[in-house]
Amino acid sequence: MDEEGAPLSEGVQVVDPDVRAHVYSLVTALGGFNGESADRYVLGDDALACLRDIKRWLKLYDEKHNRMDVARCLGEANLVNGDLLPILTLWSTSGQKSKHMSRIALACLELLVPLTWPLEVHSEMTVNHHRHTPYLQQAQVLYKRGILSHGSGSILRTIIRIGLPSMAVPRSERTTRDEGILKLMLYFLRNIAVISPNARLAAEGDEEETSRSATINAFQNQDAFALLLTMCSNVGEDFSLQDVVLLEILFHIVKGVNVEKLFMNDAQRKAKRTDELGELLQKESSLRREYAKNAPTRHGRFGTMIWVKRDDAKVSTVSGQDVLKDSQTTLHKMDQSKKWNKPQIRRRAAEVTANNDFNTPVNINSTATKNLRMFVEEFLDSGFNPLFTHVRKAIEREADRVMDINTRQFFYTVAWFLEAERVRRAHQREKRHLGDTPLKEIEPDSFALVASVLNQETFVFLNRSMQYSYDNKDVEDLTAEMRCFTQILLTVQEMAQSPLEEDQEIADNIQNRIFYEETTHDRIVAIVRGYKDQGFGYLDACTELAHVFLRMLEHYSKENVDMHVRSRRRAKRKAKQAKQADIEGDDEEEASEEEDLMDVERISKERKFDFRRFAAKFCNQSCVDTFIAFTKYYRELNVDQLKRAHRYFYRIAFKQEMSVLLFRLDIINLFYRMIKGPGALDSNKPIFKEWEELVRQIIRRMIKKIDQRPALITELLFSKINSTVFYLEYGHEKQTISASKRPPAELEVEPREAKTIDEKIRIVVHVMVKDEHTDLVKWVSDVLNSAADEREAWESQEQHSGGQKAPNPMIPVKSDNESCQKAMFSNAKLRLLMSLVRFERLGMEDVPGASWVVPSSLNSQELRHTRSIIEQCLTEPVTENSDRDLSQLIRRKSGNNTRRDRDDQMANVDFGSDSEGDDNVPDGPLFPPNPRSRANALEQLKKQRKKRRKQAGEEEEPDEEDLEARRRARLENALARQAKIKSDLYIHASDEETDEEADQEFFRLEEQRRKEQAERIRKALLHGVVEEVSENSRKKSSGRKRQSDQYTASTADSQSKRQRRLQQTEGLDGNDDLVVAGTEARSPDSLGQGSPSLKGANDVEDTLVTSEENELDFDDDLAFSRNRTRDKVLSAENDDSDTEPPAPDTIDEDGEEAAAVAAPPRRRVRAGFVIESDSE
């Protein structure tokens, strides 16, 4: 313990002397170097007990009392370098087989872990902590130097040997002691990786011995990297509790290391360093030149003071020889002398985490670069997926071993290794392109090596963590998460450019999932807007994320034109005034969870994505200020960072046409200095030309805009709000149109409860009175009263005017009360009452302020009658004890009624035909699809409805696939039935061919049918009866109906055009003035089976028209009969119809044995005159 120790300031008692005496005695009794053999350490008689006592002092005194006195004493006594490291060397050389020595070695490890535990400066430190922390930090650096460069042995390899027996035990057989030994071993490696020289303390010795390069080389030479690879590749199988410690070790090894330099060869690295040195020398020379311009001369070092006369006739004093150069320099010197005490914003004190700072770059030597690159490549090939999958799951379930800092370490380490994988692949492609021998061939599924962080679970975890860090203002965590998100996007972009189709499909799927959520878009915009002095690391991360996200999203939206995003908005629910809140409170509490889920479903909806609309969110002064703050570091930025800022300003000024946002004095001054100086960009850089052209175009646009808008000269001093931007861009203020409110839903009174208008008015009035809207009801009554008086005066004036009738004027419905005017639009029950009293709204638009009038069709008596009903309801008390609630009788007007009303209005409108050649067919389509008709179709529909109601609660509703399958089956059945039809009514190509014999036979049969029909009609006119049709004819007719061969008899529309042209050329046999009305007697050929839709009385009159009736031009509105009271049934037997008994005015068409009914004669009438005919 006499070797080098940490310096102690004498004369100051920082530790209790009794504590120091006890600790020193334990260290002395532990052992020491023998005088005979100075290189050999000799243990004391009770060394193991001494080590355990020292451990108890650390635990019971320092940890229990939250002090560092024992650790300070051990550092002063040089316990680590003077005793513990020699004991471990002794065990590794000669004592591994001794169980006693193994226990001593383990006891040494138990002391090394707490003594090398990293120290952090935090807000909960006591005075004792502040006193001892600097000394202990310096002591730990000495511990690390002794561990890494111990002369007589490899300490790290020795520590690993202590833990190897516990690693060899299967996980299921390990004891708590084995798990503790593994934990001690890994924590010791973690501590060695964390310890680094403190820049605020004076360094002792060579810093290279404790640098990152020395740590990496020691880990490689002493098999620590091999241990880490073995454990990382078996996490989850053999090592489940060590995942977080392994993550910490990796984080502290790779943090701050430049990935690009890591994968460079020696020649590239040498060229890179030469370029960096040249840039530094050039910066130095430029600074010297700038200084030489204003530097004092050798003989001009005496004081200089001048007076500067300003515009307001005031005089200012400026000192210094440099002010004599020119007036511009003088004014610049005056500006430099001004100071602005900017008010400091009180912020939450940020915790200093020097050990976890990953924004500070670290340089490593060539040997360490080679060793680290080998370890990184092997880790990517074997340990990446198992480790990060297991750590992510542990963080998500909040395991006990997970600390808050581990989330930041996880995301940063993932981002670093993803970037390493991309750079490795790029260098391998470059080597193959140059013809060099590749170190390793990339497998076709090589992206599977990092697939564990490209799944949906990682994206959800990342988005949730980013939102949590943003909400809680955790700057460091959010920076790590933004870096991780950026590297994931870049990796996916590289996957999309892969020659493998599988990689391209996976990349497209990942981009679809990332870009589908609009909350991700909004979060990135909010992060960029919210920058306020969070540091350069945060600034670099957020600008890089915005740049990569915008570029990839623009490319993806161009490839996927129909891209949709899911937007989630918080539902705006109006508070309802419910008087029965106490009664229904319990029910609402039970259903609250379901209602919340329903609300989430309602507010999540898809919409088409517009990239220009999204890019416009970055066109605001906050985002511009963020990138301006980033650009102010232009002297320290590399080419990629300068290009990032250039692309953003180019997008703002030229793509989005929002260059007005850049017209601010400090921004223009920054751009000018970047190009013209002082302190300009290096003109040899490739990015300089692009920046020069951009600045030239921006200043050119600004001058042009000043000529157009002189007000811009004043606005150059300030940031631009949206209204100012719009005015400067277009020359006028933005015209905003307030969105009109939607009218309330239409209401109606239950038709079954109120048959008449008076009953409906009573119900509505009672409900409005119950809802405390009596003032509105009285207003309607007053309007009716005044309208009745005015209408009475108008009617009396008409009576005195001598009989000349003028239309009654419409009376406007107005109100001086503003609340009443609003209620005319927003109160649905008032609108219902106004509709019931027959007020009408002018115009088609239902907007606030629409005019209502009393129509001219209402006379004074009707108005007074309506008012009397309202007054009667107001005087009658509302019965509260009624069995039914009147408010339940008012319901929302159903969409079916509205649709039916619209259909009724459009029923008589002829829109023409979309088919080629519009044949004017007044009675329907020329060729109907011939649906299958059923005599009991109505009954079948009723049974189906009842069956559905019964099965509604038992079976689930059919989904869209089942409905589509049923629809296809119905279509196939209809096509199969149509295929069986043999009728020549359907037009074929062969109809154009002429067959004279067939035409003659057709004309002969048609002439015979016309004569027979004319004879039957003539007999019916003379005798008033219809002759019986023969049984054979009836059976033939029914047989033809079943075969669908006489489809022409069921509808007049089924005749072909050729038949109609022939019938129109035939003349009438009798008197030209003979008008024969439609008869109820029909020939057997005219009785066909029609569809159920053709069974109404009107349909029968419209469809059952024979060829003779068309020829004689019958009028369907006239029916002939000699005696209307005589209905003589001639035959009513053999009626096998299954349908219901026909109505008196209809004929049973479904039965095969239709009964012939005597047609009652009727006088023929034309133009109101009775016409007698000789035919009678």
UniProtKB/Swiss-Prot annotation:
Its main location: nucleus. Residues 981-991 have a biased composition (Basic and acidic residues). One of its GO terms (biological process) is meiotic cell cycle. It is found in: Nucleus. It holds the Pfam family TIMELESS. Forms a fork protection complex (FPC) with csm3 and which is required for chromosome segregation during meiosis and DNA damage repair. FPC coordinates leading and lagging strand synthesis and moves with the replication fork. FPC stabilizes replication forks in a configuration that is recognized by replication checkpoint sensors. Belongs to the timeless family. Component of the fork protection complex (FPC) consisting of tof1 and csm3. This is Topoisomerase 1-associated factor 1. The gene is tof1.
